[in-house]
């Protein structure tokens, strides 16, 4: 595909925090002398005991250890709430937009302080203190943020489990971190449908040792009739009436754990990613400010769920540490109509909008009409997160949503990294659709070949990071050996991201997908993202997912799942046309061997495509699909199985 370059517009540069020259100067300082750079920027948060040590990190085999600001003491809630009260107590901290468009509320910093203190006192009355783990299984309601910050206030460690996880998944995570207390809601609301959260908690607890969970706190969201276990369960509003709205914040060490967040391993049990207090907050707040070019008084909206790391870093901790107004959205982009995102932007005068490529692609399928009937004049910066954004979706987002006047920050990072690692900066970086562009301050990407040799210049290979940054995860909860094995054993002295990438002649990075999303066709390595981008460039295609499957001749064949735009029909003619299209675009080696038209793709409710399921169906092995409870629409799996193209009695 021809490479398009978008220059930094004067309007972006004129009001940006930094320009290209300043970025280069700061980046050079951050990698040549990280001690001085982070020693200075570590002061962006308040410390009850100032740090004297900045960086103490090692990626050495058998001795992986990551510590930042280790002799300092601070408290995250103090930094996200209390320090703002004198100057911005009456400013809105959180705008909550309900699933129902008629339901929304503004919570000021002063109100947030009172609510968080109340929640902290409710927890403290039930024995929660420093170092205790608390599991949160909540919908996107303000109480989710209150609970996170209440745990932080007490020095307790929160472990959020996304509301789409099944009782089995929830049970394994409660057990994994040893939570004695669970906070949930009677029911969640998403797209007009109810989600039985409390019932799922009850089911999960039945699978655990009887004496593990002592308390379940239930937030009343729908008022639905739910079973309450006497002595164990309590409604939050009743417990909150018994406590005051003042609660001192516990100063904790910089390396005290703030949260555990489980992420899927490529094998076996999910990993409990541990993030700590000081370095994480410095990095989350700094990336939020510079990546989104956040200015005081702006309204910022990240559409993620707090069940995922994006919600932790860029709905709650980063924005609130910066005294921002952050929007929390309970609903989905298509309810009650495809205009919902854009209507919310107009309603709350959103300036910065951060969403996932999968949401953009699904809305693209409905055409420009639902976007163009709204104004979106308040928008200034657009962001993308979660997976590489294909150039066609990037272009639609830029042109249709942003009216070609808003920069797009295509951010690359991971649960493990705590914050954004590779990204454009609005006033400093020329944009290339589909490229995450350049590293953030302190981040040193290196490209490595399969043998572990570091590659120079323009190249393609495995993406690693050479040195630590403050937001980096510290360990896998209860299993440091697994941490070393997963991230540091593949390439000596490097953090291996698990992603492949291409670096172009300008030093820009293009993420090509997980290394396990690489297909080896007749000895040729190919990132699935490239084939997907080609398919989505076809005018009739809304979305595509590509996986490998065993092929008698080639080793692996290419299996493409394609969702068409509204009104298009999946004919044999179109199937042939799409195969020819890819062949012409990338070359014969990239031609899909099998192509299945799919009304929908299996996605988690955060919008990630579940490629594991697609691989199994492509392999005609759908008896072992694993846990599909996190899917937004489990029914799509049945359709995919019914119409699979690789039944064993068919020729490949």
UniProtKB/Swiss-Prot annotation:
Catalytic activity, EC: 6.2.1.1
Cofactor: Mg(2+)
Keyword Magnesium: yes
Record-listed ATP binding positions: 386-388, 410-415, 499, 514, 525
Reactions performed catalytically: acetate + ATP + CoA = acetyl-CoA + AMP + diphosphate
Sites bearing N6-acetyllysine, chain numbering: 608
GO cellular component terms attached to this protein's record: cytosol
Keywords: Acetylation, ATP-binding, Ligase, Magnesium, Metal-binding, Nucleotide-binding
A molecular function GO annotation: metal ion binding
UniProt-listed PANTHER family: ACETYL-COENZYME A SYNTHETASE, ACETYL-COENZYME A SYNTHETASE 1
UniProt record similarity statement: Belongs to the ATP-dependent AMP-binding enzyme family.
Protein's UniProt name: Acetyl-coenzyme A synthetase
Source organism of this protein record: Methylorubrum extorquens (strain CM4 / NCIMB 13688) (Methylobacterium extorquens)
Lineage: Bacteria, Pseudomonadati, Pseudomonadota, Alphaproteobacteria, Hyphomicrobiales
Gene, per the UniProt record: acsA
